[in-house]
């Protein structure tokens, strides 16, 4: 399965499918969309209003990756369901953390 993240020289780029008002804050795994694009499914309780859901996704990713929230930035898709986040840090270590979080 193709991974929804890409290593960068200064971190990691992660493609996320957001589920706002999802009842809980969690990373739920990888999904391959109908167009073949792999995405990391992230569910948050926050509503998609005034950037609240984006901030909640940023916090969920930061916690899951064990990095400060300031290291996670929204690169694209502020109002879209599929978003692109950049995470600053050691890309290899961050990718390993996502892999461990999702399991085999």
From Swiss-Prot:
Coiled coil: none annotated. Transmembrane segments: none annotated. InterPro entries: DUF167, YggU-like_sf. It holds the Pfam family DUF167. NCBIfam families: DUF167 family protein, PRK01310.1. Belongs to the UPF0235 family. This is UPF0235 protein M446_3939.
